[in-house]
Structure formats: C-alpha cells, structure tokens
Amino acid sequence: MIILDINQNYKYFMFNKVCLKFKIKNFNILVIYLYDIKEKNIYKTIKNKIKNFSYFFKKMPCIINIKYLSEEDQYFWKYFHKKLSNLGLCIIGVSGCNNKIWEKIITRNGLLIFKEQINKKIFYEKKNKITKINNNYIIDKPIRSGQTIYAKKKNLIIMNTVNSGAEVIADGDIHIYGIMRGRASAGASKDTKSQIFCTKLYAEFISIAGKNWINENVLNSYLGKPVRFYIKNDILTIQKFSL
C-alpha cells in the first residue's frame, strides 16, 4: 500500500520507506529556430551540424521554435518533422506557436507546445537564492570524453584539457588552463556573477546561470584564444584576455 505524506513523498505504509518524490528541476534544452523549412539545404545543414558535434546532440532533447515560419510553411511541416526525426534529433516539443492552426498541426504530431512567456516574479525569487562558494576544487588531470565533474559550492580549476564530450560544472567560477573542447556550466546555483575562463577555447557548450552558448555562437576570431565568459545586462558575453 502506498500513501502520500505531507512532504509530497510516497511511502510504503508498512515499512515507512520513501519510494518516489515529485520535484521541479531546471534543465538546459537546445532550441532550434526555423526561418524557412522550404529551403532545400536545411536538412543538409542540420545533418552536418549533428555529424560535427555528435557528442553535443547525442540524446540532447531539443525544442523547435516556429515563431518565424510563414503560413505557407504549415503545408510542409509534417514532411519536415519526419525528416528531422530521421536525423536522430530528440524533439520533445515546439515553441513560438502564434495561431491555432499551427497548434493543431503540432499536436497531431504528438508534440508538446511550450509557451515562451517567463514568469518574472518566480525568476526573480530564484535568482536571489545564491549558493555561498566556500573553496576551490582543483584538478590537474585531463577530463576525458564522457566524464562529468561537478564542483558543488566551489569554484572549479582545471590545470589540463577538457576533451570533447566531457562536461564540467561548478556552482562558482570555472578556470580551465588548457584546451577547452567539452561543455562548461558555471553558476549552476543561478549565481549570475560567476564566470568562465579558459586559455584555449573550442568549447561545444558554455553556460552561466542558465544563459547558454553553443559552438556556432562563437566567432572564429575567439576560437583557440584565451577568453572569459560573464553575464552583462542579462546577456552571456565573451571577452578576450592576455596571458
């Protein structure tokens, strides 16, 4: 027998043992913005992107934003969605639906519709809950593909390379004194003052307090250079620095 306790935990009545919990969590989700699905080369472009960054796209959930598509594009959606699915993208839903016709088309495909509106009050309250950073977590070995390192309540300092397919996370700042090819997420506790520093930038993914960049967002002039990432005016910003 299972009962619901006042803490929203389900327990076995006889053994008083927790068997499941309900929690609200925030996750990073890739959003693909579409502007014209009639374009002949769009499939080739997406396919090449997946091939070049296979570690990034592998099992990564994504949302398709159709805000900029025309009414004419509605007739091509079913075919386009099928082609995208065949490329291996894990599409969980669609955002940017601006009329009921689009909503009907999307729901027929069995996809969820995500609203783009943000509850500013809730966001503000969460933003104030900053985790206190107590110390530094230092690693002098390379971070291999498939590894995930999390520096809880700490700054993370890596004195080596972060390989493609690896992920480093910290509640505070991240310093990488080597080649950065993987994924880095600083300010995991929503601290917008957190920063990321690396001496050679080739990252697949960069995030600070939920503000994200992927590799294609980075101009070529910054690749391979010493840079820092920080948030300015609520925007994730990149800046070169001298060693």
From Swiss-Prot:
Keywords: Cell cycle, Cell division, Septation. The keyword Transport does not apply. Gene3D superfamilies: 2.160.20.70, 3.30.70.260. Pfam families: MinC_C, MinC_N. One of its GO terms (biological process) is cell morphogenesis. Interacts with MinD and FtsZ. Cell division inhibitor that blocks the formation of polar Z ring septums. Rapidly oscillates between the poles of the cell to destabilize FtsZ filaments that have formed before they mature into polar Z rings. Prevents FtsZ polymerization. Belongs to the MinC family. This is Probable septum site-determining protein MinC. The gene is minC.
